[in-house]
Amino acid sequence: MSYLRYYNMLDDFSAGAGVLDKDLFTEEQQQSFMPKDGGMMQNDYGGMNDYLGIFKNNDVRTLLGLILFVLALYSPPLISILMIFISSFLLPLTSLVITYCLVTQMYRGGNGNTVGMSIVCIVAAVIIMAINVFTNSQIFNIISYIILFILFFAYVMNIERQDYRRSINVTIPEQYTCNKPYTAGNKVDVDIPTFNSLNTDDY
């Protein structure tokens, strides 16, 4: 007689033939290491059919925000306001304002008004960033961002006014200017007869 007739090795295991997969592991164990839906994560980043989920990735958001920010740097001041406003939905407005003010003052320069407004915008942005470290109030973020955007709008308008004044005060090239001295008086080198110089005795 066969040995297996008296001894069945499957009797020594709690899980043998006919046991389903769900009976092998508890629910917590399945949630910890077993993949779902073909390994695609749908909770945070979208699944295979959720193409809009790609915009939730930080790398894509950062890339689009940086592209708009660079376009804002090389655009007219009024258009740059719109670019920064759109970029604020992708990147923090505080970082955009600080970088824009620093770069603009470096390659544009400006008078006392623009320099002062840039300092005010930078200080306000730094204060907002510091407060956000300790608080996470959505109401404070909305109010502070509105105030910061108003200050930034005033700064950009000062730049627009400065560029307008520079366009008016255009220097005339030297070849088109008259550099010869001029004094008032008679420039004709001939004697102009007068009434007293006429000789009337001959008539």
Swiss-Prot record:
Intravirion side: 87-138
Propiece residues: 1-16, 185-203
Membrane topology category: Multi-pass membrane protein
Cysteine disulfide links: 101-121
Database matches in Pfam families: Pox_P21 (PF05313)
Any one GO molecular function term: hydrolase activity
Virion surface side stretches: 1-65, 160-203
InterPro entries, per the entry: Poxvirus_OPG144 (IPR007977)
Phosphotyrosine sites (modified residues): 203
An individual GO BP term: DNA-templated transcription termination
GO cellular component, one term: virion membrane
PTM annotation: The 23 kDa precursor is cleaved into a final 21 kDa form by the OPG083 protease during virus maturation.
Regions that span the bilayer: 66-86, 139-159
Role noted for this protein: Envelope protein which participates in virus morphogenesis. Needed for an early step in viral crescent membrane formation by interacting with OPG125 scaffold protein. Its interaction with OPG125 scaffold protein leads to the formation of rigid, crescent-shaped membranes that assemble around the cytoplasmic virus factory. Acts as a membrane anchor for the protein OPG154. OPG144-OPG154 virus envelope protein might be involved in fusion or attachment, and can further associate with OPG153.
Family, as annotated: Belongs to the orthopoxvirus OPG144 family.
Record text on subunit structure and interactions: Homodimer; disulfide-linked. Interacts (via N-terminus) with OPG125 scaffold; this interaction helps OPG125 to associate with membranes. Interacts with OPG140. Interacts with OPG154; this interaction allows OPG154 to be anchored in the mature virion (MV) membrane. Part of a complex composed of OPG144, OPG153 and OPG154.
Protein name stated in the entry: Virion membrane protein OPG144 precursor
